[in-house]
């Protein structure tokens, strides 16, 4: 089982953005020190829900500050990025980190980002498959041209090429690409391309198991080898808060997370003025406490093991900054690595 952290760079009420980003960086450094497998970085624009606007840039910093841990984006928002530019960045990080970078991509939401960065609502509603396929071609082929509805350009060479990684085998020829999936449509899209899924922390085990089953069915129907389908490295996002008593862990989150959630979710603005109902912050926090490893080390290990058994997923990206406090976050990460991980081996 491969357990990592999910870093949103969440700005809690009363905190500055520099303070928030410092906590995000420190949580990743402590994750490596504590023996965790990976760090997954979120990306948001114009909202305190998360103050990292470029997951791939923060990934570059963390890859430079660490030696062993895998660093991934969860996710880079594809509709507001040029697939070739993102592909070049991914290839660069893949080569310079010795293959420790994973590129998670997703559609994002119908937010004002689409206006600011220029692609418009159509890129969000219809353009994701074209962007994803162009990105994959850039990471896998020596020369690429664009002939799609959104991206059209003459053939150019891929520089640098991911398959020129030093000391790598065939499995290292391309950085891992993973797709955030929230619907049967996105599951089918990922499965047809043989790409593993990132499944959100709002989903319970039953929903995730259904999505994994659908992915397997669609991947096999698309002609992917059964052994590749069986070995797909899907990632389950969740929340982790470790304490000596379950009530103490839950109390920490229920007391502190709703303030961040309300401030962050309320700040989202749709590009076309459509109404988007946001979750009740307290109810959502309580839901997360019930779904994920929130409690004692034994309870946390049991929850992770149960999720893995029910869904077949063995990789986890766990939000560890739910207290909003630097020292508490560092302690939470250390306990996850030193007290929970040993119970899973």
Predicted regions and their residues:
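Alpha-helix-loop-beta-strand connector modules within alpha/beta enzyme cores
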Residues: 52-73, 127, 131, 334-345
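Hydrophobic faces of well-ordered beta-strands that scaffold small-molecule active sites
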Residues: 3-7, 39-41, 71-73, 101-105, ...
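Short, acidic/polar
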Residues: 18-30, 181-188, 299-306
């Amino acid at each position: 089982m491969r357990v990592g952290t999910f870093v949103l760079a969440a700005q809690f009420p009363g905190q500055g953005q520099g303070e928030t980003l410092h906590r995000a960086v420190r949580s990743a450094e402590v994750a490596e020190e504590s023996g965790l497998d990976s760090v997954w970085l979120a990306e948001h624009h114009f909202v305190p829900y998360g103050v990292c606007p470029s997951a791939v840039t923060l990934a570059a910093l963390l890859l430079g500050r660490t030696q062993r841990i895998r660093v991934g984006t969860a996710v880079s928002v594809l509709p507001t990025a040029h697939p070739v530019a993102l592909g070049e960045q991914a290839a660069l990080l893949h080569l310079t980190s010795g293959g420790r970078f994973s590129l998670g991509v997703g559609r994002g939401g119908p937010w004002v980002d689409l206006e600011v960065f220029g692609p418009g609502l159509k890129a969000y509603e219809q353009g994701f498959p074209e962007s994803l396929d162009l990105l994959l071609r850039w990471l896998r082929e020596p020369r690429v041209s664009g002939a799609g509805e959104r991206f059209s350009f003459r053939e150019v060479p891929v520089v640098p090429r991911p398959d020129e990684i030093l000391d790598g085998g065939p499995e290292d020829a391309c950085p891992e690409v993973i797709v955030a999936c929230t619907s049967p449509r996105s599951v089918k899209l990922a499965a047809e391309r043989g790409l593993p899924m990132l499944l959100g922390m709002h989903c319970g085990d039953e929903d995730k198991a259904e999505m994994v089953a659908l992915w397997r069915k669609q991947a096999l129907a698309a002609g992917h080898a059964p052994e590749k389908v069986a070995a797909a490295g899907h990632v389950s996002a969740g929340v982790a808060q470790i304490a000596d008593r379950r009530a103490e862990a839950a109390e920490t989150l229920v007391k502190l997370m709703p303030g961040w959630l309300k401030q962050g979710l309320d700040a989202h603005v749709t590009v076309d003025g459509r109404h988007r109902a946001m979750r009740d912050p307290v109810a959502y926090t309580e839901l997360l406490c019930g779904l994920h490893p929130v409690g004692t080390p034994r309870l946390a290990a049991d929850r992770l093991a149960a999720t893995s058994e029910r869904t077949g997923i063995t990789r986890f990206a766990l939000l560890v900054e739910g207290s909003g406090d630097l020292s508490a976050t560092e302690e939470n990460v250390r306990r996850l690595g030193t007290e929970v991980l040993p119970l899973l081996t």
